[in-house]
Amino acid sequence: MPLPVQGNYTNFARLTNEQKTVWSLQFWRQARNAAFINMFLGTDANSMIQQITELRRDEKGARAVITLIADMVGDGVVGDNQLEGNEEALTAFDTVIQLDQMRAANVHEGRMADQRSIVNFRTTSRDMLAYWLADRMDQLAFLSLAGVSYAYRTNGALRGSSPFPNLTFAADVTPPSANRRLRWDGTNKVLVPNAATSDVTAADTPSYALLVNLKAYAKTKYIRGLRGDGGEEMYHVFLDPLAMAKLKLDPDYIANLRSGYTRGNVNPLFKGGIVTVDGLVIHEFRHVYNTRGMAPGAKWGASGNVDGCSMLFCGAQALGFADIGNPRWVEKEFDYDNKHGISVAKILGFLKPQFPSIYEDGNTEDFGVINVYVAA
């Protein structure tokens, strides 16, 4: 990623440890703030993306662990019957998030190129590398939620020579489980479980009816929501821009926004802001998995010609994010100090938690996310 640059290089590659720490923290703050997933991070179980910042030490060593607590299955005792000896042990599932290092670097063309530029190399590199890391974290997070291999981009196209499939945590990406993999049948207005993308038709576009049915489905499957103001359960829903456009054109969706919000420019129907419908916070994001980058015949539908989107319905602990330590900032000189380079490195990991659900006869299911295949 060569950049035309200029600046005072008398101290290049000679920063003190304290100065490196400052640049590293500035870089990470900028990357974190630019990442879309940052809005959904939290350190406890009432977070859509639970952020693990410390390693847990046990007999197996230091590991990044996310803990899922299953609901109790017993009914206790009644009256004066003996409770002691009839206690129910809490069932906890400790799931390890594998860690790996992501690195990238910039190098400029040389001192003569510096003289032709007014851009400071160190500052520009920080900005460019921060955006790179933020964007790649977003991509990996949404591929993990969709259960799609890192060998693909979020538009369904192959990455080519990308190293992402070699990330340690890439091996833990799992397809959506049977009862968390749905198709919206737009003709009959029903959700179809254990769905296949080949069954998607052009009529299966997002609608208000889908949102209502999906929330009801999640409640019956005990997908735990996020506690909002007043203790109300909230969920996050994600669509790519074209799927969101189809939802915005649904007459029932339009009618509910018109009647449910204040009229005028503050109405999200006109303002284009984030919409909350029946406890569902609706988000539009370009990295929600879709088929835009696939060749005709390889998309969805019986003939492979239907463009689609894997709409995400997320509750608590939908994703685990291991965020271990500050990034590393390294400056280096090349070619007899004629060229300069900057690299950054961050240790992290993603995991979509799964657990044996007592509500699905003990079958392993995705813990906090439902994928819904829709036409877009």
Curated annotation (Swiss-Prot):
Secreted among keywords: no
GO cellular component, one term: viral capsid
Entries under InterPro entries matching the protein: ORF017-like
Cellular compartment(s): Virion
Domain of life from the UniProt record: Viruses
Main location: virion
One Pfam family of this chain: Phage_capsid_3
Keywords from the UniProt entry: Capsid protein, Virion
Function: Assembles to form an icosahedral capsid.
This protein's name: Major capsid protein
Organism of this sequence: Pseudomonas phage KPP25
